[in-house]
């Protein structure tokens, strides 16, 4: 069973994105004639502006994490916090999906931040980031006005608006420190880490969530500009809709937990939501989904590479230290198993000698 799981996991991680990509390419080819009826062009200036927007969002990640650390009682220099955050993201492309977490925790501990606080800051960062994505999408539903496909699906625009309002209220409840602390310590227990006392006030959590909302607005604006670069007649009303779609698509990709960075799932969500929200041909939605992944990934790699190189060998040293710790833990486990086996053998021998003596 375990061997089957080990084989199935990489197959899913590699095969599923390829299947989704193949489906997207199929629809792009199928709808290409329909796409040719639109005014379709490449605007280099707008593409560069979109790239700059995704770069700016990458920088907000480190700034928000630094703010969370400060509110938990640990302050870092601005340049150091950006370098740690971005450089630790470099190892996210290593199989395992946990190396960037461990690297950041070990690296920040060099500057006096305890590991429980570091883990807590990352959990708060992640929860508020996901919540902000849902919040931004819920607000964007208020702009889903004259959309026949949504009406036919949900029996009227008022229901869409009500859904957005209820989602916002639910998020405000979940982000309360008592509830958030319960989620946080549950996650830490699952990671076999010590629980922490969340010292954040409700206002602190709301401020951090608001900062993430600003980050999503920046990325969503870049996403809208990307669409504008290909389809110059994109209406302005599409701006808040694009912001909401990009934010919730990132959330969907993240919580899929199957493929790295939600590869395939995020693109599928973008295409599906565009089909509901905007009168775009399927081919154009597919191109935007793939292009947004490409441009945002290039922006991320640029920021991460600069931070990683500017950090010198420190990030690599932290990785080696973490691998050494994992090796020591494995050796300790093997030694404990050997002691237990030796003890069991000794006990069995004593019992057998006693039986023979009797």
Question: Where on the chain are the PLM-derived regions?
Answer:
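Predominantly cytoplasmic-facing regulatory/coupling regions of multi-pass membrane proteins
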Residues: 1-86, 143-254, 277-358
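Membrane-embedded alpha-helical core segments of multi-pass
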Residues: 61, 99, 132-143, 164
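Transmembrane-helix boundary and interhelical linker motifs in polytopic inner-membrane proteins
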Residues: 70-72, 79, 100, 106-116, ...
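Extended non-transmembrane interhelical loops and adjacent amphipathic helices
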Residues: 82-110
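Transmembrane alpha-helix interface/packing and boundary motifs in multi-pass membrane proteins
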Residues: 87-94, 247-267
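Membrane-embedded alpha-helical segments of transport systems
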Residues: 90-95, 109, 119-138, 252, ...
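Interfacial segments of multi-pass membrane proteins
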Residues: 106-117, 267-284
